[in-house]
Amino acid sequence: MRERIIRSGDVELWTQAIGEPDAPALLLNAGDCQSSMDWPEDLVRLLADAGHLVLRYDYRDTGRSTHREFPPNPYDFDDLARDAVAVLDGWGIERAHSLGFGMGSAVSQLLALDHRERLTAITLLGSCAMDVDFFGNWERALTGEPTLDGLPTPERWFVELAFNPASVSEIEFYRRLSGDQLPFDESELQQRIDRVRAHAADEEPVEDHPHGQIRQDWTKRAADLAGITTPALVIEAPLDPIHPPPHARHLAESIPGARLTTIPGMGHYLAPAIHQPLTDAVTAHVGAGM
């Protein structure tokens, strides 16, 4: 493992490379409010052993990257996409496969729209298409108002917990995100939580994380998805409470030539049971996109 601090404008990003230096690069873009250490170690190892140079990094305001107050220093998903490009530049990587989970899928979609020359492929999981009024749907989940597109809102229990995270333990929150069809390894999650906290030893917990304050209207880019030429794979998680089916299918249908793969039993959580199926899907897609 090699570590490197990389500058993106006036922000410093902590980054790490795992795998053979000359292997095809795989850039990991995590979920919102998550650092590089939120990627399960077993999954990272499997991806590296499968022949990828895995690049993971701390978003701004996470881990060991630059932390600043958001209102005086606002940014949006376009800035996060530019940060991702800076990571590639910092490691001397011309092109990479971008794997995005949750918010990282939005970053990957923007990379495919605005920086397609830097990509070999994208894999999207735990996300929705850009024509979905995601932030408005949180309110609709609470009021019962129908969505603008007929697609489902996040499940009400998730929105209620997201607005009141102290009502359950962190482990219980992730247990619910994972769903009830796959084994839930509490000890593995606790180790991951401990690793995240140790990695960000100087980070003070905040109630309103900057990522949660981004309110960029990405629906303005919805029509642009039809212009994506980067080979795309969408992973469907049948038990995802944030983007329930058929969101993944709708996302795949919004991108020309995109393939859809379902991982049975998966929720909005990278449970140990999905690490090998996800690695297999990503590896096969990288081969198809090269």
Regions found by a protein language model. Name each.
Residues 11-67:
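Conserved HGGG/HGGXW glycine-rich cap/lid loop of the alpha/beta-hydrolase fold
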Residues 94-137:
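Conserved hydrolase catalytic core segment
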Residues 241-247:
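Conserved alpha/beta-hydrolase "acid-adjacent" motif
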Residues 257-290:
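Catalytic active-site module of serine/aspartate enzymes centered on a nucleophile-bearing elbow/loop
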